[in-house]
Structures are given as structure tokens and as C-alpha cells.
């Protein structure tokens, strides 16, 4: 005779339709009076009872467990839809791109509750064969934040992604700078193009692309203030960027930069050209007061600038336009100043860095430091010329 199950052990029966054993446990009633029943299924009695034990353990841990079919893709899509509210549009687009191209294809079909640290390690190791370390960190961050959000909403008990370190990836695209001869070739090739003024100002002031795209005419002073004491030369006030809220990258990025004569000349011409564009556009013109805008006054995005920049460089001698980006004009600015012996502290101020350490780290390939203070002082002390 079969042994009778103890009170509270729940039930166990064969489901003919599903062809599985179903183990059930009655946990009382919820606040609305509805009976709370937990179930576990399996091909054998033991498997069904073990599955029920897992469900009961999760319930005792206080977890409102997600449906068993809840996948990594579900968690990532939920995070993209609701977890990025209030973020900059560029951030949302970047996270969406990384998630849809790398996270979901690799791990999306995996059930979230079954995702293990080993799964994540293998996925990262595979991605390390093609992605740079920085890109690996970005895709790991997307997955980590998605699972963390799912855990906060009781979809999973723990976040295994946090247990996984990011491996070393492939070397990223190295930064580079124009030589003086290349810079001259770029400036000459840009003449007569819509990007001429942009390229001249970017190369000769070192302003960031995000700062130039947000530059407005009321922050451009082409005549300066010669009558004040001390006199102010022509300058631009770099106080805004296209970042969310219009703030510059850091507090010290807010700076006022004197304009070289070549910049003043091209900006006067650009101001006149933009006036003709405004007349040609007529009612289609959108007035934003931007120095650098589309043919109808609209703000430029990074893709617009990069495409037009490469188009302007296509006839530059010794330059493969497809290998260069607008941000490398800033690298070139640093390199040209360093070649002329401008102190690192001064370069750091001009590019809007919070300190020289940042400049050395970001532009270490462009900086050519020669620490000569000690040699100069010692020469003055001992007054001995070089041996002949």
C-alpha cells in the first residue's frame, strides 16, 4: 500500500495532457483571499518535487519569481525601454546599438534565471576576439545594468554579471595627429567647401567637436574689445556643448579662446556665406543662432560633420580622408603646439582639461615633453659651456 503523504507536503499528480508529473503546494491565501498555490513539473516524480522545492525556496526568499520563460533579451529590452529615462539621446542610441548588436544575439535567448557567470565569461571571451577593451567594458555595462534592474524587480535572485571581470580586448583605433605639412594640405583642400571655417577653427583653437557644433554667434567676438583695459583680442567663448543640458564636458572646459588671424578671416567670410544661405532657404530656415549649421540652419550631428569633413579632405595631398575624423583636428592642435615648445600646462588650459595629468593621458602620443628646467638652472649656476 502506498504511503500517504504528510499534511503540508502538497500534492503530486500525473498531467496526461502535458505528459509530466506536477507537484503542488498550498501556501494559504493572499490579501485578496485568493489561494496561493506553487507548482513544479518534471518528467519524473523526483524531478517535479525538486522543481517545487526550488520554487518554494525562492518564495521563502521573498522573490516574486518571473515567468520561467523570462529571458536575457526580455531583461535587456525592459532596461532599454524604461531604465534609460532622462538620459541623453546619444546615450540611449549607443546603449541600444550595443545591446542589439552584441548582447541580445549572444545571450538573449538564455533564460535569465539560468544565466551563469560561466556563460558571461565565455561570451566576453568570444567578444574579446573582435572588440576593443573599451567596447567590451561598454557591452558588459549594458548587460550588467539590465540584469541589475531585473534583480531589483524580482525577476532573478542575483546578478551574476557583476561577478565577471572584463578581459583585455583588441587594441583600439590609435589616435593620430596631422604633421605641419599635412595640416597645411588639409587647410588648403578645405578652401571653398562648406567645412572650411569649421576645419580652420577646430585646428587652430583645439575646440572639441561637441563644443563647435553648439557654438553660437553671440559667443563669437570677431572684433574683440580693443578699447578696454587690457585690450581683448578677437575671441570665442566656449561655454556650451551639445551634451545634455548644454554644459561643457567639465567645469574647466568653459574657457575663452583668442582667435588666430586666419580664424577671424574665415569666420567673417562664413558669416557672410551663412547670410546668403538664409536668404536662399527662405521659410525653410530655422534660426538657432548657430555658427556651424546645415543649409537650413538646423544643428549638425556628429555623422553630418564627419561625412562633410571627409568630403572636404578628399583632395588633400598625402591624406586618406577615410582614415581621419574631426576629433583628430584637436589632437593635431596639441601636437603642433607641443612641437613648437609650448609648455604642457599652457596646452592643458587651452584644450580645457582639469589638469596636466589628463592632457598627458589623453594626448600622450602627441605630447613631446622635454623637461629642461633643471638643466637651465644648473647651466646658470655653474656657467660651463658644452665641451668641444
Swiss-Prot record:
Superkingdom of origin: Bacteria
Cross-referenced CDD domains: INT_ICEBs1_C_like
Gene Ontology molecular-function annotations: DNA binding
Entry annotated with the keyword DNA-binding: yes
Active site residues according to the UniProt entry: 208, 249, 330, 353, 363 (o-(3'-phospho-dna)-tyrosine intermediate)
Function text: Required for integration of pSAM2.
Listed name of the protein: Integrase
Amino acid at each position: 500500500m502506498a504511503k500517504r503523504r504528510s499534511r503540508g507536503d502538497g500534492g503530486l499528480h500525473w498531467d496526461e495532457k502535458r505528459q509530466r508529473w506536477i507537484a503542488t503546494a498550498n501556501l494559504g491565501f493572499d490579501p485578496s483571499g485568493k489561494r496561493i498555490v506553487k507548482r513544479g513539473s518534471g518528467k519524473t516524480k523526483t524531478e517535479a518535487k525538486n522543481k517545487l522545492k526550488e520554487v518554494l525556496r525562492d518564495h521563502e526568499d521573498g522573490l516574486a519569481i518571473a515567468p520561467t520563460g523570462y529571458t536575457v533579451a526580455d531583461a535587456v529590452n525592459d532596461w532599454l525601454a524604461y531604465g534609460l529615462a532622462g538620459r541623453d539621446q546619444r546615450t540611449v542610441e549607443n546603449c541600444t546599438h550595443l545591446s542589439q548588436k552584441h548582447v541580445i544575439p549572444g545571450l538573449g535567448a538564455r533564460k535569465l534565471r539560468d544565466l551563469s557567470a560561466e556563460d558571461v565569461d565565455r561570451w566576453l571571451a568570444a567578444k574579446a576576439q573582435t572588440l576593443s577593451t573599451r567596447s567590451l567594458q561598454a557591452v558588459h555595462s549594458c548587460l550588467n545594468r539590465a540584469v541589475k534592474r531585473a534583480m531589483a524587480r524580482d525577476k532573478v535572485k542575483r546578478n551574476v554579471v557583476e561577478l565577471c571581470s572584463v578581459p583585455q580586448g583588441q587594441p583600439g583605433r590609435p589616435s593620430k595627429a596631422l604633421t605641419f605639412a599635412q595640416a597645411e594640405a588639409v587647410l588648403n583642400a578645405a578652401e571653398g567647401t562648406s567645412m572650411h571655417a569649421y576645419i580652420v577653427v577646430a585646428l587652430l583653437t583645439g575646440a572639441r567637436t561637441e563644443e563647435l557644433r553648439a557654438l553660437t554667434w553671440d559667443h563669437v567676438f570677431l572684433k574683440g574689445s580693443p578699447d578696454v583695459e587690457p585690450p581683448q583680442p578677437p575671441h570665442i567663448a566656449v561655454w556650451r556643448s551639445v551634451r545634455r543640458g548644454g554644459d561643457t564636458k567639465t567645469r574647466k572646459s568653459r574657457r575663452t579662446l583668442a582667435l588666430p588671424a586666419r580664424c577671424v578671416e574665415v569666420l567673417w567670410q562664413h558669416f557672410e556665406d551663412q547670410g546668403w544661405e538664409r536668404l536662399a532657404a527662405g521659410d525653410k530656415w530655422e534660426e538657432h543662432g548657430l555658427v556651424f549649421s546645415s543649409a537650413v540652419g538646423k544643428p549638425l550631428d556628429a555623422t553630418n560633420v564627419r561625412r562633410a569633413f571627409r568630403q572636404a579632405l578628399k583632395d588633400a595631398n598625402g591624406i586618406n580622408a577615410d582614415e581621419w575624423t574631426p576629433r583628430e583636428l584637436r589632437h593635431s592642435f596639441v601636437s603642433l603646439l607641443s612641437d613648437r615648445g609650448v609648455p604642457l600646462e599652457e596646452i592643458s588650459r587651452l584644450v580645457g582639461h582639469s589638469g596636466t595629468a589628463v592632457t598627458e593621458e589623453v594626448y600622450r602620443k602627441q605630447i613631446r615633453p622635454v623637461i629642461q628646467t633643471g638643466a637651465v638652472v644648473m647651466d646658470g649656476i655653474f656657467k660651463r659651456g658644452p665641451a668641444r
